[in-house]
């Protein structure tokens, strides 16, 4: 195989002197697609579609800020000497767990204020969220980040990867494990599984689609994170791996507890929104 092409340009085009990055285009596309699918499902679950748009307008900027804050905090050794780069999110450097923390707080407050069951809203969001995560990893691909350990060209070719992926994994003179791809495929598979199962009658109580998402994502992220070389570290520990373990165990624990102790009181996911303002 002739591998003569260089790395892909992370900049898509220039607009009036402003560089538009593929990273931003890919993330924005993922958000738009996720919003469209969430609106469609909200209608089926008796939630005003405008609520989804309003929620996105609040949650998205908060998620971006907390995702960046999370990343900067764990990379403070670098950013304390490069303060001007803290706001440069278009260059990459946002953490999904940070985004989930910020967005989760917004979802809770928004739903309480608008008479929407929090668990139901999380169920609606979960499948499209993991889809957006899977798409978003291709932004990391364009920036040549979220890659894994050094590997060989022979190994990458054995995976039957397209030429452009193999060449993009040539970083600093060495081929790298395409961990972005592993996680992207895992996320997209999770999206397919959740979308296939969530409309099964009496299968999910409200909250269980979301908890299934957490279990699925945390399980895959733990193993992918172990292959990466750019993990955020704290006291020599991969932060995302520990968070994955906590979320995996926690979600299973909550799922079992709710099924055993609250099963008869939990509405089915398909029942949709049963709340109304007083």
From Swiss-Prot:
Pfam families: LGT. GO terms for biological process: lipoprotein biosynthetic process. A 1,2-diacyl-sn-glycero-3-phospho-(1'-sn-glycerol) binds at residue 137. Its EC number is 2.5.1.145. Keywords: Cell membrane, Membrane, Transferase, Transmembrane, Transmembrane helix. Pathway: Protein modification; lipoprotein biosynthesis (diacylglyceryl transfer). It is found in: Cell membrane. InterPro entries: Lgt. It is a multi-pass membrane protein. Belongs to the Lgt family. This is Phosphatidylglycerol--prolipoprotein diacylglyceryl transferase.
């Amino acid at each position: 195989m002739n591998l003569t092409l260089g790395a892909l340009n992370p900049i898509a085009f220039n607009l009036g002197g402003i560089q538009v990055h593929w990273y931003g285009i890919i993330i924005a596309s993922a958000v738009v697609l996720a919003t469209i699918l969430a609106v469609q499902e909200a209608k089926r679950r008796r939630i005003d579609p405008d609520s989804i748009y309003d929620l996105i307008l609040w949650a998205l900027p908060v998620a971006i800020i907390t995702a960046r804050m999370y990343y900067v905090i764990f990379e403070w050794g670098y950013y304390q000497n490069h303060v001007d780069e803290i706001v440069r999110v278009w260059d990459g450097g946002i953490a999904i767990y940070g985004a989930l923390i910020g967005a989760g707080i917004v979802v809770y407050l928004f739903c309480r204020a608008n008479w929407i069951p929090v668990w139901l809203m999380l169920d609606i969001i979960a499948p499209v969220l993991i889809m957006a995560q899977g798409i978003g990893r291709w932004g990391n691909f364009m920036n040549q980040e979220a890659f894994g350990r050094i590997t060989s060209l022979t190994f990458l070719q054995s995976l039957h990867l397209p030429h452009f992926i193999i060449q993009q994994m040539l970083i600093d003179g060495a081929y790298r494990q395409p961990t972005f791809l592993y996680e992207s495929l895992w996320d997209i598979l999770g999206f397919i599984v959740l979308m296939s199962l969530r409309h099964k009658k009496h299968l999910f109580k409200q909250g269980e689609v979301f908890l299934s998402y957490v279990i699925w994502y945390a399980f895959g992220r733990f193993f992918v994170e172990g292959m990466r070389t750019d993990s955020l570290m704290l006291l020599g520990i991969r932060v995302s791996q520990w968070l994955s373990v906590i979320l995996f165990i926690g979600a299973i624990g909550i799922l079992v507890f709710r099924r055993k102790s609250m099963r008869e009181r939990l509405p089915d996911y398909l029942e949709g929104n049963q709340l109304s303002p007083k």
